[in-house]
Regions:
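Binding-site signature for planar aromatic cofactors or substrates
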Residues: 1-146
Length: 146
């Protein structure tokens, strides 16, 4: 599903994760992330409490935004997220976080995101229509749905 351009952008830039529950959106920037060989997106869970609550309330529905600030190339990836608390991905994030925060924090788990739709957000590019449930949440705040 993810072509090489999308994977490259995901590996080289920070992401924004968007979730929504009860009409209230939540967006968080993430730097502790990776793309697996099979095209799944993984995010270290350090401070994702609201994100996890929203995912539990919406069957794991999530959107990930990534873009290059210089070229304006960008993508939105929509899919389903699963929270895992053990395994090699979690161990990798735990080591990374403990080193980064010098033992003051640790990863509680990881989100494993299975992409379902990729939308080009690069200015001037053609794109797909909005997902109704996610846009309903955004429209409640009078925000534009791409």
């Amino acid at each position: 599903m993810l072509n090489e351009n999308v994977k490259k952008l995901l590996k080289e830039n920070m992401w924004d994760l968007a979730t929504c529950s009860a009409g209230v959106p939540n967006v968080v920037p993430v730097a502790l992330k990776d793309v697996t060989d099979d095209g799944k997106l993984v995010v270290g869970d350090v401070f994702l409490d609201t994100t996890l609550r929203n995912l539990a309330a919406t069957d794991g529905r999530i959107a990930v935004s990534v873009y290059d600030a210089k070229t304006l190339e960008g993508y939105q990836i929509r899919g389903a997220a699963e929270h895992v608390t053990d395994g090699p991905v979690v161990a990798t994030f735990k080591t990374m976080v403990e080193q980064m925060f010098q033992g003051a924090a640790t990863a509680k788990g990881a989100l494993v995101i299975t992409p379902e739709t990729v939308i080009v957000t690069t200015p001037g590019a053609s794109r797909m229509g909005p997902a109704p449930a996610f846009c309903t949440c955004l429209k409640s705040l009078k925000l534009f749905c791409v």
